[in-house]
Amino acid sequence: MSPYPHLERIGSPADLRATERRELAQVASELRAFLIESVSKTGGHLSSNLGTVELTIALHYVFNTPDDRIVWDVGHQTYGHKILTGRREAMSGLRHWGGISGFPRRCESEYDTFGTAHSSTSISAALGMAVAARDRGEDRRAIAVIGDGAMSAGMAFEALNNAGDMDANLLVILNDNEMSISPPVGALTKILARLMSGSTYNAARRVGEKVLGTVPPMAELARKVEEYAKGMIAPGTLFEEFGFHYYGPIDGHDLDALIPTLQNIRKLKGPQFLHVITKKGQGYKLAEADPILYHGVSKFDHTAGIQTGKSGGKLTYTQVFSDWLCDIAAADPRIVGITPAMREGSGLVEFAQRFPDRYYDVGIAEQHALTFAAGLACEGLKPVVAIYSTFLQRAYDQLIHDIALQNLPVVLAIDRGGLVGADGATHHGAFDLSFLACVPNLVVMAPADENECRQMLYTAVCHDGPTAVRYPRGGGSGVVPLEPMTALPIGKGEIRRHGTRIAVLAFGSMLGVALEVGEALDASVANMRFVKPLDEALIAELAANHALLVTVEENAVIGGAGSEVARFVDTLPQRPRVLRLGLPDRFIDHGDQAQLLASVGLDKTGILAAIEAVYPHNS
């Protein structure tokens, strides 16, 4: 007998809506159990998905999806949504090569109304959908589901500010699993939310507004009385000021609270705001006890749980950065560490513990993080911003206008440069070398191994100007970082192998495969180290002695390091052919990093084939 008899009968939200309401609790239980079993086999995001089981069921039960639009902020909490919308069997390939994505994708399902993965975009997107429906006279609802972390970002508040004046049928659901608002969650607030979302209350409210609106002092008094009364129970005043009708907070794991409240809200017009309280890891004691550990997981035994401890493997680049930052901070009190809500992922846990007064988590606010760092640099401190490549994209103006233009000594420690694997197109660091190389005053470095990463970080903090050190996700080549730390000469690369006819110019993580290609072709191999400034003397030397220069980078080939090499070679009197290899002009899907590199021709076989196509071995 199947352990999921109710779940297996649900192939779409229509099947869910045909389910007896009294059976929904069992559906939730089976969905949660299936999530634990499935994610333990594939890896993925677990805690956040366990925390949204009941909310997901209630939304698809009450609203007429996909005609009513649900936009999930960030999107890593949508596994339950995928299961209920016909993708239960596809979960076995979640985040794997050729399988379904770990985030919503419009091309994957009509129920994925908007692609997400970066935070704080849901309200803007849902508002656009709601306004389009309003202007076309369509009676549908747009719902944005956003977490309390994502709600802290400026873009979310920009959208709230705009939405309050739009009079569109938008529902914003705040999925609150961090704030300490436990006292208001109970029978009183459940009743209050149900009453406040009901037709009787809202009809009376509209009548009262019309009557009292004819007497301005009375209207203001009524508003203040209502605001005061609600303020004693719920933290909704802020959202009311934006022009929303606020309901909650209610228990996000209580279907008997969620469903009637959503049913009432669905009947209302204009912008509505529902505040639900959930718990990450709900229903799986190990994840409840440590939701951070179970936030993003690899395959594990769900009965025994994730086994922590030293793996004894190679250092990851994130660990190299973490060790360096603690070492340099111990020697220099001017060092401060900044992260936009990525303490664990960016390697700042130990720094935060050892130097709490010099550690700043600014929340999901990449723009603020960079300008905050610029302000610190103005006052003589040495800020180090630890940030993923994909999230640095969100702060490009601040990098140019607030840091580089003023030539401020801010260090950008850019993690996850290149292809990151299972998170896919939304998280690959595919564009950073392209958008960094054109910024004046900025020094851009890409280490080839762990030791070089440590030395480059030290070089960055010694440099009196803005710097970026861009390193890949995962482990290095096993090189042990050397002591003492030494500042590298700015803009100087090195020859790692001398050969004939062909020279391979490797940037960062591509050095290892470049050396393999060099051995196969008896080619010269250069470790370029710096994307900006380029080692023009080294390039000129290679150009004078080789018929073909091959640039290899784990970055978009358009506008990347290879483009800069080709631009310089074009100024030389002796101009060999330049073959630029990198990521193609398309978004790269998810899968194992090695699979992805092979798929875009950046493994040994692919590089050799590309060279053979333009410069046959017998030439």
From Swiss-Prot:
One Gene Ontology cellular component: cytosol
Reaction(s) the record says it catalyses: D-glyceraldehyde 3-phosphate + pyruvate + H(+) = 1-deoxy-D-xylulose 5-phosphate + CO2
Cofactor notes: Binds 1 Mg(2+) ion per subunit. Binds 1 thiamine pyrophosphate per subunit.
A Pfam family matched in the record: Transketolase_C
GO molecular function: 1-deoxy-D-xylulose-5-phosphate synthase activity; magnesium ion binding; thiamine pyrophosphate binding
Pathway assignment: Metabolic intermediate biosynthesis; 1-deoxy-D-xylulose 5-phosphate biosynthesis; 1-deoxy-D-xylulose 5-phosphate from D-glyceraldehyde 3-phosphate and pyruvate: step 1/1
Top enzyme class: transferase
Residues that coordinate or bind thiamine diphosphate: 76, 117-119, 149-150, 177, 284, 366
EC number per UniProt: 2.2.1.7
Entries under CDD domains matching the protein: TPP_DXS (cd02007), TPP_PYR_DXS_TK_like (cd07033)
Name of the protein in its database record: 1-deoxy-D-xylulose-5-phosphate synthase
Gene name as annotated: dxs
